Structure formats: structure tokens, C-alpha cells
Amino acid sequence: MSISAAGVATGLGANVELKSNVGSSSSSVAGVRLFTSRKAQLRRCAAPATSASLYSDANYDLNNYKFAPIKESIVAREMTRRYMTDMITHADTDVVVVGAGSAGLSCAYELSKNPNVKVAIVEQSVSPGGGAWLGGQLFSAMIVRKPAHRFLDEIEVPYEEMENYVVIKHAALFTSTIMSKLLARPNVKLFNAVAAEDLIIRGDRVSGVVTNWALVAQNHNTQSCMDPNVMEAKVVVSSCGHDGPFGATGVKRLRSIGMIESVPGMKCLDMNAAEDAIVKHTREVVPGMIVTGMEVAEIDGSPRMGPTFGAMMISGQKAAHLALRALGLPNEVDGNYKPNVHPELVLASTDDMTASA
């Protein structure tokens, strides 16, 4: 039986196995021994109960409801063992996606279709999703311009169709749907409440990220020493959004160390120009680092797009295929991608993929 780093049995094709010996009290991941009290077992969820069976079953007597007993230490061990296992597994990973907004989530979702690609998502907020929980000015609806609605069809998000765009009744419907589908995949791990403080640079190549708890990253000036951790990666996808406390941090760091010349910042709003430009210029800005989403507008000085989200989804998809190309795998950019994709999806031009330093 193959068990993912999260301790969930996954069947064939899992990248990392938690190997357990029958009768043994220890396991190992990537050569590191881990404690486990018993052999893990896969149990499928029971079929959803109807309202009639819910109230007729004695186990669901809401006036006398009883939970199975548990020791508090078991809860602590289960959480800690799985999280530490995930950290060990992703200390050296294939792709790190920095930022779990709509572009970062779309990128990770597209990457996760290849079960042999390990994906770690680093998000400084406790709640992933970036600005995609609401539309503009804290309104509920999300606007997606065609033809990006085909991505919504793929992940099965319902919408109201207009002539040139579609409307999702609440932005949270998109974000919750893509997260639930993405995080169920065994080759993906989301590290939320974790900040990318810096980059790992070897020569002229980005080779990973420097990480820390987000609360620590925001409070270095209050303590004497709170050193970070690291994640090595073959590819880093920076989807840190537009300017802000954690905004555009990837390209800002590249500028500060002289790997790119400038980060002019996004221009004033122009929806029609902005979305096309963001998808077109999603690219590998330096070897090992791909920029996607609104961070593209920050590095290029292109217009901001405001409360329309199609470019975030397609820019994220394009970033994923650029990452696959960097890994030497089939991808849509090179036209050799075989899995189940929409034939109507035509990625924007990929000329000049690497910006000059």
C-alpha cells in the first residue's frame, strides 16, 4: 500500500511513500525515521446520508449524540507527524508556488494533473485565495471574461452566461471549488500561514525559497533572532500579486539583488488591455523563476485590470505549462501536451519568455 506524505493511502503513482512494516513502530520518509503507532489503513467515506436516514439512525440521535473517545495526545501526534512529514517531503520539491491567490491556485491545479510532479504552495495568509473570495469593492459576484469561462467548466463552477463574459454568483464559489479539488490530490501540499522571506540563488538561477511562519516574518524587529527554513525547488512560480505587505515580493527581491533592472509597478486600470497583457507576458523572468498573475503587471508596468478574474486563471495555467517545460515534461506551450485539456484553450504568445536582466 502506498501512503502519501500526508499519511493518506493513495494507490499507485504517489511520489513519496510512507513505508510501514507490519508490527513495526517506526516509519521513514526520504530516509528519515518517523514514529507511528500502527499501520495506516485506507477507509472510504460512507455514502452521504439522506435527511430521512440521518434522523432514523440511532447514531444520529441529536439529543444523545456521542463521539468516539480519543486521547488529546493522539490529536497532537496526528497533526504533528503529518505536518513534519510534509515538510521533510517538500524540503526538496519540483515546483514551489508562492502565493495562493487565483493565479497561484490555478497554476497549482494545472500542475497537479501530472501525478509525478510534486507541488508545494506557500501562502502567508491563514486563508488562501488572495482577493478571490469577493469581487470588486467587497461585492460578491465574480466576473470572468470569455473564453476563460472554459476553465470554470473544467472545474465545474456554475455561472450565469452573458454575451462576452460570465458571472459567478459569489467569488467564494470559485475559490472553494478549486481548493477542494486541488488539495485532494496527493502530489500537492499547501503550507498556509507560511511566508516566503527570500529566494535561494545559485549562480544565475533561482533554486528555491526561504520560508518562515508568517507571524514570525512580520515580527523580526521585535525579537533578536528568528532564523528561517528553506525549500529547494527545480522551479519557483511567483504569484505574489500586486504591491502590498507581501505583494510582488518575488520580483522586488530580484531587483534588489540586480537580477532584473526594475519593477516599475502597474499602471492605471484598463481591463481590455490588462488581461491580455498579463497572460501574454506570463513568463520565466530569470532561470528557475516564473512570474504569473498581477505580479506580471508589477514587473512590466502594464495596466491593472480591476475586478475581473479570467486573466488570473489563464495566466496561472500558462505558468504551470512553462514550469512543465522547465522540468522537461510535455506542456501546452510546446504543443506536446496530451492529457485531457480543452482544445479551444489557446495560450498567448510565448515569445521573449525570459526578460533581460
From Swiss-Prot:
GO terms for cellular component: chloroplast stroma; cytosol. Disulfide bonds: none annotated. Its cofactor is Fe cation. Keywords: Chloroplast, Iron, Metal-binding, NAD, Plastid, Thiamine biosynthesis, Transferase, Transit peptide. Substrate binds at residues 103, 123-124, 131, 196, 227, 242, 294, 304-306. It is found in: Plastid, Chloroplast. GO terms for molecular function: cysteine-dependent adenosine diphosphate thiazole synthase activity; iron ion binding. It is an enzyme of class 2 (transferase). During the catalytic reaction, a sulfide is transferred from Cys-225 to a reaction intermediate, generating a dehydroalanine residue. The modification 2,3-didehydroalanine (Cys) is found at residue 225. Its main location: plastid. Residues 1-51 form a transit peptide. Its EC number is 2.4.2.60. Pfam families: Thi4. SUPFAM superfamilies: FAD/NAD(P)-binding domain. It catalyses: [ADP-thiazole synthase]-L-cysteine + glycine + NAD(+) = [ADP-thiazole synthase]-dehydroalanine + ADP-5-ethyl-4-methylthiazole-2-carboxylate + nicotinamide + 3 H2O + 2 H(+). Binds 1 Fe cation per subunit. Belongs to the THI4 family. NCBIfam families: sulfide-dependent adenosine diphosphate thiazole synthase. Involved in biosynthesis of the thiamine precursor thiazole. Catalyzes the conversion of NAD and glycine to adenosine diphosphate 5-(2-hydroxyethyl)-4-methylthiazole-2-carboxylic acid (ADT), an adenylated thiazole intermediate. The reaction includes an iron-dependent sulfide transfer from a conserved cysteine residue of the protein to a thiazole intermediate. The enzyme can only undergo a single turnover, which suggests it is a suicide enzyme. May have additional roles in adaptation to various stress conditions and in DNA damage tolerance. Homooctamer. This is Thiamine thiazole synthase 3, chloroplastic. It comes from Physcomitrium patens (Spreading-leaved earth moss). The lineage of its organism: Eukaryota, Viridiplantae, Streptophyta, Embryophyta, Bryophyta.
